[in-house]
Amino acid sequence: TCFAEHSFFIALALAKAHHKAFKLYIPETRPYLQGAHLTAPAAAEMGYETALITDGMPAHFMGAGRINKYITASDLALLDGTIVNKVGTLENAICAKYYNIPYYATSLGADINKKNRQDIVVEYRDPNWVKEIQGVKITSSSVGALYPCFDVIDSSLVTKIITPEGPLCIKAQ
């Protein structure tokens, strides 16, 4: 099996092969902290300048003009241009659209069995993950929590879906 970040790292490797240099602002990606534990260290090991930021900071850096492209992996891509990715992606995509920043999603390919967002069921995971960080409780046990693990990003927010074979041709619905 592979995880969504493979497509992201393929894109980084191709950019590196074409001598592209840029700084990466990488959100920590709560609650599992994949950005902090996986993405940022791997990008730094590839030689990219990286800045680890909290999940709430992308809007700040987009508004300040320090982010000029928004690029993510995707857990799922549809032929209509819909993207499914980690929770937090939707708010960043909306913010990118607001600041006229292109949003590129990397994908290993489209799921031809799903036609549109109505075919997607967003999984909710254990809400206790939101109430702790790496096993340390950060709030009272009397506080409720919700943990949808994926966002569904509308095609109107996506500039292009990039696959190893090239850009995915998005079909209008």
What are these regions (language model features)?
Residues 17-21, 45-48:
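Short helix-capping segments at alpha-helix termini
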Residues 24:
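Short beta-strand element of Class I
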Residues 27-173:
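Conserved phosphate- and dinucleotide-binding cores of soluble alpha/beta proteins
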